[in-house]
Amino acid sequence: AINGERILKGMDYYPLLDGKAGERVLVTIKKASGLEVDEVVVPVSAGVVNSLLYKRWVRHNAAMVEKLSGGRLGYVHLEGMNDPSFRTVYSDILGRYNHCEGIVIDTRFNGGGRLHEDIEVLFSGEKYLTQEVRGKDACDMPSRRYNKASIMITGEANYSNAHGTPWVYRYKKMGLIVGKPVPGTMTSVNWETLQDPTLYFGIPVVGYRKADGTYLENDQLEPDIDVENTKELVVTGRDEQLEAAIKALLNQLNRK
């Protein structure tokens, strides 16, 4: 039962939860023994569920990278090209993954923003000093930029700055790109809101022109290693693109 209203066999109980996100709801559960147990729960919105699923996906990917690399590599996902995502990546690569030999940068399903310059600066560090304390190495310099090996994963769902950021990563020869091609969608837009504030859209006003005179818009970015996640393996929890990125980066490290 939900809030005292019994749920009969075949009954659609979703209307009983409609509009109840964030509220205390009494749920009565009848066990096989016939005993009824009351539980007070707080339903969450679909948006919260999606956020929880996303965090679980990131944790799963990070665990797979640690397992398949033997702890040699770290994993970060750029959820968006924005400040919160950058802070998470910055904290992880210079914190929890500071001991790792390299990092897997996942940009799949990123809807864009503006972060290509920040990612370029962060991942293009070159070691020039080692800080030493009483005969023990403390840290490398620069200590606020990543100066180890990295690799980037892309996918067809990358959009806007999630096309421009991998392009800069490729152009600056920062590392290999693994995954699927990214549509040429690198532009900047002005956001316009209509009289109904739920309706808004971006109007492209800025193009990004390369030295040869062509634009990033409509210029599809091809990965160095083209890997498709087949549906037969996705449903089993496998991520072939992630596995390929791990293998390629480990091979790069082993050749040093």
Q: What label would you give each PLM region?
A:
Residues 228, 246-247:
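Extracellular low-complexity, Gly/Ser/Thr-rich intrinsically disordered linkers
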Residues 226-234:
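Short secondary-structure boundary motifs at beta->alpha junctions and helix caps
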Residues 4-196, 233-241, 247-255:
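Cleft-lining beta-strand/loop regions that shape enzyme active-site pockets
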Residues 1:
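Phosphate-binding active sites in nucleotide-utilizing proteins
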Residues 63, 158-160, 195-226:
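Metal-dependent DNA phosphodiester-chemistry modules and their immediately adjacent helices/loops
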